[in-house]
């Protein structure tokens, strides 16, 4: 990677309002930027960084509209966000105290049974050993929260932890009583959003400038991570049971950062900065970039997460929903816990039965009046005006009273059903295309509908094409729990590696339940989030890495309680090295996009195993100074690296903790890139014994990827009271025979395991040949 000096570094920041005009817009020539400044440059005459930032703006060249300060930052990051003219932006970039200036950008928002699926027990394991995460504070950065929801009841909880420094922002629709001993804090961050959206009233009817959740996403993620126990939870009797968050005794702090128009960097950073000041222990962020992950120094989430990690906060993020293409994972900085999505052993079965007697397995959450048991006429949407079933595009005369086969893609799945209903259709079969494969995602449709896989879709299209009078019916079977189909499996939508920024860091880290997850919902919109949906529900079932992230955030809270002395890196290590990569059938985890075995670029280390993570045996710990050394190893130089460091003295770590290569970062997984067929790559690792036996002896086991030889030295680690931390080195040798790099697959996979007879500490190994090559897998 090229050296990243000051001249090539741009940056991202946000925090406190000084002067703000919601009517300002891009028509005034101003744009929103995030500005990072050197903390140590603040003149002593200013009593606060906020005052200094105001002074900086006042010193800029004049423009028809004055520069407007949005936020000032001082905890997770240092700098401010502001509305600036082009001349003012250029002047700031030349200022000796400014490290970087980058445009404010928008990000996107990417359970009754999952605790049982994860193996939780009330009498043993992680729940009992952490007392359900009692008094750990989880900061949820999302669309806000619906405070009246029973998942946020504080029954049985003690006083608010004395370490909490936050507050509950009140408003016309968010009284002080909205917060309690469960929901201990709530704030809203909208200045960046309002300036970008021109302060219009376009979304005013639905939006609330308070922490109240008008969309549902934030309530869902918060209740998944740390919701209280709620009996008899369901969505129209689907998934009926007792709902509980992963850490049901943890406290929740809600930070509303997402609005109808997106989630803006300036607001995200303001919330992260505030969460650090408020005293959260875990940050859960189901938000990320659309498309490829930005470079670390222009990624506001990566920068804010670095600052949070410096304060000992675990930052758990969604990997994104851009699968199944490779190199789509976002939130991939090594100090972030990156989570992909998987299925659980619960189905909401709704089969499509065609007139020729064939039965196609499907899924649905439809809860209205069922179709008649008799067969109805069946048509393909592509023959009726709109293959993707866009609203208003279907020919009513061709679909009225019939079941319509619609193709997935282009618009929301529930919107397709709405389009069929508005055109007079009786029902819908929604067919996956090749991109989504056999992934089945249940939806609370407004019309009798089911989703089927790509193979079934192809067969039903052929049936329609070849039959003189095609017919079908839909049979709704409700909630089914069992071993068939096997689970977990990786969702087709789950974003994947390799890590396109730093290929030697394996991403995602793990996968967790993210398909058809039941959790709390807002009272503002229906389960489809469509304007025409009049229904209101307490719980909803939705899918995404947005759902898998809070599962892991909750697990991090439990581990934080069970092991209060563990660092964020140690908590990540415990989750990674105890993850599993087989289904409940004993076969390798399947990728639903292809129907083939998944791999470490798709599922990371594998599926989280909470109870094993409680006692991992060994952990790979990483201090902040080692992350600094990593940044230097990938090409960052002073003063540009100050975007992350804030404190110039930390730059010394580039020498005192120098890494031979970025791959030497003490990560709990291995990712190797061979540039040539005979290349040798060496990585060092350091492990700490956290088991009960201080004299444990671990021996190594290696599963080498094809075309690779692996040597681990030493092959035995003998710990003692005096030696609780030991080092080893791994040598990876490419042994490709003839033909060069092009003669082998672009990637292979294996593992390195350390075991003492009680613990198995497993690290995945991913190998690529030809740096920068993109493969399909």
Swiss-Prot record:
Task: Enumerate the UniProt keywords alphabetically.
Answer: Autocatalytic cleavage, Glycoprotein, Hydrolase, Protease, Secreted, Serine protease, Signal, Zymogen
Q: Which residues form the Peptidase S8 domain?
A: 115-614
Q: What Pfam families does UniProt report for this protein, alphabetically?
A: fn3_6 (PF17766), Inhibitor_I9 (PF05922), PA (PF02225), Peptidase_S8 (PF00082)
The processes (GO biological process) annotated in the record are: leaf senescence; proteolysis; secondary shoot formation
User: Compositional bias (Basic and acidic residues) spans?
Assistant: 205-218
Q: What is its EC number?
A: 3.4.21.-
Write out the ranges of the annotated region (Disordered).
Answer: 199-223
Q: Which residues form the PA domain?
A: 376-461
- InterPro entries found in the cross-reference section: PA_dom_sf, PA_domain, Peptidase_S8/S53_dom, Peptidase_S8/S53_dom_sf, Peptidase_S8_Asp-AS, Peptidase_S8_Ser-AS, Peptidase_S8_subtilisin-rel, Peptidases_S8_3
Q: What residues does the annotated propeptide cover? A: 26-110
Magnesium found in the keyword field: no
Keyword match Hydrolase: yes
Gene3D superfamilies, sorted: 2.60.40.2310, 3.50.30.30, Peptidase S8 propeptide/proteinase inhibitor I9, Peptidase S8/S53 domain
Q: What class of enzyme is it?
A: hydrolase
Naming one, the record's GO cellular component terms include:
secretory vesicle
| Localization terms from the record | Secreted
Q: Which GO terms describe its molecular function?
A: serine-type endopeptidase activity
Main localization is: secreted
Query: Where's the Inhibitor I9 domain?
Result: 32-110
Please give the residues the UniProt entry marks as glycosylated: 198, 232, 395
Write the signal peptide boundaries: 1-25
As for family, the record states: Belongs to the peptidase S8 family.
Which PANTHER family is this protein grouped with?
A: PROPROTEIN CONVERTASE SUBTILISIN/KEXIN (PTHR10795)
- The identity of this protein, by name, is Subtilisin-like protease SBT1.4
Organism in which the protein naturally occurs: Arabidopsis thaliana (Mouse-ear cress)
Q: Which gene encodes it?
A: SBT1.4
